[in-house]
């Protein structure tokens, strides 16, 4: 968790701060697996670092591949709300050419080739493929844009006075990108179309990698995890992109497939966290994970979709902390919630538009969830055992 690692921003080389940490891929390397990174796994400034190792950790891999496609060389063709900037603002391009010419297409090709090599050599492997899309700029071949006619796209709306129902820090999180507030509907539809196109393009590249698993026969004894590093707003709550504590930004996709699983094709309702991936993969592969890990294994859910390894998912951003249970999202801002709270009931408000935290009828629920959240905050702030930390100013930029 950020309060354990003290890393609360991007653009950091992990060894500068945690020099003796054992990363997940290192665990596999130390147990005889050949570990390869393709594309964006650690932080990258996008698209600036495409074709480089970004803020990668070289100790984590036996081999790395840094694909660079025509999306990088065609940057001058990209539309951007902020001319000259691409990654931190809304930007897109309906590109010419084929999937295989794009950076992520090149990554998928490399992954497929590597899988064929491992199948031939019968070597155990850990392969991490990080696709850049749908990170801005939303670049995908034109055919993917054509799948989503703009006239059919509905732009999310926000009721008048909505911001006043939120604590000040939550309001500020929705207003931080000034040039993206109150976008015209047509521009919004263009952005949504481009986002959908880039997701579908990325999905096609995942499909190519999975096809290679099937074709090589590796699928029968390979664990596959599909996920992302954060969720996204596309106009919901009047906001675009990431970094809020709403479901849109805090929730990520998670699909796990493993040999011998009996709950295949089922959805698990229990909450899960990203810190759970490491212990889960360790258990599935019969390895011993470091004792310092804060996560829990999700392995039991692969055979029992009703299993509940944890009861809430914990998220931290800025001065805010949030938990998500089966029914509720509860968020507090500032120390002990002094800057306000939010409560959303997903049974009646899956869009999280009605803050119930200050309603008397919900006082008991707020008190109960606040207690759980404080316990989670305390646990998430305990320094990890056996991990050396080098303190530094988190505002310092690492280029």
Regions flagged by a language model, labelled:
Residues 86-98, 172-193, 258-261, 348-353:
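Short glycine/proline-rich turn/loop motifs
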Residues 39, 126-133, 223-228, 255-256, ...:
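Short beta-strand segments
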Residues 137-143, 212-266, 273, 310:
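Histidine-centered active-site microenvironments of extracellular/periplasmic hydrolases
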Residues 45-69, 102-162, 214-223, 364, ...:
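Active-site regions of oxyanion-processing enzymes, predominantly non-cytosolic
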Residues 12-22, 100-101, 164-165, 192-201, ...:
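A short beta-strand-to-alpha-helix junction
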Residues 1-22, 27-37, 47:
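Active-site segment of extracytoplasmic enzymes that catalyze sulfate/phosphate-ester chemistry
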Residues 54-55, 60-71, 100, 118, ...:
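C-terminal cap/loop subdomain of S1 sulfatases and analogous C-terminal strand-loop tails that border
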Residues 105-119, 180-222, 376:
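A long, amphipathic alpha-helix that forms part
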